[in-house]
């Protein structure tokens, strides 16, 4: 397969988000995520950074993230292909049927777009927060085994023939009994500092599963420039993320970013996920900012080139 690099993209900002004190930095140009001009600018910046597409974080058909996914796809040039990170299951009040309906809608409404990301002829979809999936009654699973059973039921209703590629997020290899590969979202945090050094272990899980079953599985390596969600602990800055200790990782003028790349490249990932293009609450963005200018677009372009030179 042709190597590619995508970045997590968050399409839910309002102008007041840049003045509320919940972020550690601000974009060079303030924007509302619904603005087509801002989306077009982001696509151009991403291409300048060597990215091949976005993983657009997507909540539901009736959410603004759906309209903004459509804008990303329609505004992209022919060589920029995006997917979604599916999040319907983490919304309050959802149940298994809601997740099934949302996935059916997503596949029917978006994956046939010429700018939707594919591996071969199969659309690729990423998922996050695997253990937060509700059952038929809307209850959360007691453990990963129960979550895997729920996801298995969902896939049997939505895509039993595996016509689409589903990437699971997390550190439990058994999700590959339902999903087609693994990636890790949070590669550094307060509970497990510098967790990115475990990339060879995570890749090994995927390759071992593949060897054991004879079924092709995909490993996506995650790289990131830094992290700073300290301001998310302020009153009024709560969001849908699972509560965790606020944490900051110094970018070291790009040296930290390089270390995450150095951990991932030897694992020969099928593709790379940059976390993130614009996760401002977590402070992991490469989007041009007040503090860093466009430095991280430039560094990302170098890292993308290094990855593709190996393939």
Located regions from the model:
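Glycan-processing catalytic domains of CAZymes
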Residues: 1-311
């Amino acid at each position: 397969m042709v190597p590619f690099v995508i970045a997590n993209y968050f399409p839910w900002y309002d102008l007041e988000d840049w003045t509320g004190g919940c972020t550690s930095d601000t974009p060079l140009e303030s924007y509302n995520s619904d603005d087509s001009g801002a989306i077009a600018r982001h696509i151009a910046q991403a291409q300048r950074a060597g990215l091949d597409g976005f993983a657009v974080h997507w909540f539901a058909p009736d959410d603004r993230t759906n309209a903004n996914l459509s804008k990303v796809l329609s505004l992209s040039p022919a060589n920029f292909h995006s997917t979604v990170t599916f999040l319907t299951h983490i919304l309050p009040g959802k149940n298994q049927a809601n997740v099934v309906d949302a996935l059916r809608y997503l596949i029917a409404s978006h994956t046939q777009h010429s700018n939707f990301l594919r591996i071969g002829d199969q659309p690729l979809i990423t998922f996050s927060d695997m253990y937060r999936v509700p059952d038929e009654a809307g209850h959360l699973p007691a453990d990963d085994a129960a979550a895997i059973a729920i996801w298995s039921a969902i896939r049997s209703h939505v895509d039993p023939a595996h016509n689409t590629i589903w990437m699971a997020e997390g550190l439990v290899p058994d999700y590959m009994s339902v999903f087609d590969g693994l990636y890790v979202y949070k590669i550094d945090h307060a509970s497990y500092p510098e967790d990115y050094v475990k990339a060879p272990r995570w890749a090994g899980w995927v390759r071992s599963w593949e060897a054991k079953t004879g079924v092709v599985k995909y490993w996506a390596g995650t790289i990131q420039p830094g992290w700073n969600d300290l301001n998310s602990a302020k009153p009024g800055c709560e969001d849908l993320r699972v509560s965790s200790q606020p944490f900051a990782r110094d970018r070291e003028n790009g040296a930290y970013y390089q270390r995450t790349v150095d951990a991932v490249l030897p694992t020969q990932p099928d593709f790379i996920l940059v976390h993130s293009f614009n996760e401002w609450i977590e402070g992991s963005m490469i989007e041009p900012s007040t503090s860093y200018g466009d430095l991280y677009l430039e560094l990302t372009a170098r890292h993308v080139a290094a990855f593709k030179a190996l393939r």
